[in-house]
């Protein structure tokens, strides 16, 4: 029985799934919008939201050791300091007054080859 099982397996073993989600999250932060299957978009969305929340906390904290710890926590997903800098200093400040809901999933139809449902996962623009 699958009671209380949160994660979708996406027909992959654990390390493959972890790599897939980290790569999708990286793509979202680099280009701010990706086209992928709906199932993958729904699977990566919580990871992206959690990372943005950590980046917001890193910006708002006064303790330098806490800021370093949060930056390292974000870095463990990507292992790319430039990307962490972009997330913490460019993306997170956009959502300073927003409590969650930093992304949206727009369904765009079906893939021609295998009829998989495709979606756009994008970061929301800054509120005016």
UniProtKB/Swiss-Prot annotation:
One GO location term (cellular component): cytosolic large ribosomal subunit
Record-level GO BP terms: translation
Keywords from the named record: Ribonucleoprotein, Ribosomal protein
GO molecular function term, any single one: structural constituent of ribosome
Pfam families attached to this UniProt entry: Ribosomal_L17
Keyword Membrane: no
Gene3D superfamilies assigned to the protein according to its UniProt record, in alphabetical order: Ribosomal protein L17
Keyword Ribosomal protein in annotation: yes
Highest rank taxon of the organism: Bacteria
Oligomer and partners: Part of the 50S ribosomal subunit. Contacts protein L32.
Entry similarity comment: Belongs to the bacterial ribosomal protein bL17 family.
Protein name, as recorded: Large ribosomal subunit protein bL17
Organism: Petrotoga mobilis (strain DSM 10674 / SJ95)
Gene name per UniProt: rplQ
């Amino acid at each position: 029985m699958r009671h209380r099982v949160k994660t979708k397996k996406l027909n992959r073993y654990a390390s493959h799934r972890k790599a897939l989600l980290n790569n999708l999250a990286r793509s979202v932060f680099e280009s701010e919008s990706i086209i992928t299957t709906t199932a993958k978009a729904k699977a990566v969305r919580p990871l992206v939201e959690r990372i943005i929340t950590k980046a917001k906390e890193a910006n708002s904290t006064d303790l330098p050791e806490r800021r370093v710890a949060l930056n390292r926590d974000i870095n463990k997903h990507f292992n790319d300091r430039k990307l962490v800098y972009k997330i913490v200093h460019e993306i997170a400040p956009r959502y300073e007054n927003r409590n969650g809901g930093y992304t949206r999933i727009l369904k765009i139809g079906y893939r021609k080859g295998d009829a998989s449902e495709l979606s756009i996962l994008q970061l929301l623009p800054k509120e005016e």
